[in-house]
Amino acid sequence: MKKLKTIFTILLFATIIYSCNNSTGIVVSDEENAKFQAQIETFKTFTNGFYNEDIDLLMSVMADSVQWSPPNYNGNQLINSDGLRAAGISYFESFDGITFNEGDGLVGSDNGFWSGSLYSAGETNTDPSVMRVYGTWSMTHTETGAPVSNKWYGVLTFNEDGKIAVFSDWMDVNGMQVQVNNYVESNKQ
C-alpha cells in the first residue's frame, strides 16, 4: 500500500508540473497573417525597385513621412523621404543587378521575414506591423565589375496604409568598398 501511495504521489506531482509548464502556442489570426503576407510583398516591391533601378517603384512603398535609419553611422540621425530617394539613386549609379536574397546568410533557417515576438518585457505579440527582414544583397560594382555581397538585417514598421513608415537597416557598408578594392587589386595586370 505504501508503494502504491508513493507511485500515486509521484504521478500527481508529475501531472501538476507538466500542466504548469505546458503552455499553448500563440494563435496568429487570418487577418494578421494576411497583413504579414502583404507586408512581405511590399518589401519585395522595394527590392524590385533596386533590381530594376526604378526609384519611383522603390519609393512607392514608402510613406511620405518615412523615417530611415541608414546602415552607416550618421550620429543616429533619421533621414526623410528625400534622403532615402537620394541614397537609392546613389546605389543605382554605383551598382548593377542589385538583388536581395531573402534568408540567405541565416544559420538554421532560410526564412527571411519575421514578425511578432517574445519581447524583453516578457510579453508576446502577434501584431505584424513591425517586421524583421534578413538576407543578403548581391550586386556588381558598375565602374569595376566587382561582385559585391553583403549580409543585411532590417526592421520595418508599417503604417495603416501598408506602407513603410519607419525603416532601420544594418550591413557592413565599408565592407562593400573593401570587396571592390580587393577585386581591383586581384585583377591588376
Please describe what each predicted stretch is.
Residues 1-8:
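Bacterial N-terminal signal peptides that target proteins for export
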Residues 5, 21-189:
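C-terminal and inter-domain tail/linker signature
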Residues 11-13:
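Short, linear, compositionally biased motifs with a strong N-terminal bias
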Residues 15-19:
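C-terminal motif of bacterial Sec signal peptides marking the signal peptidase cleavage site
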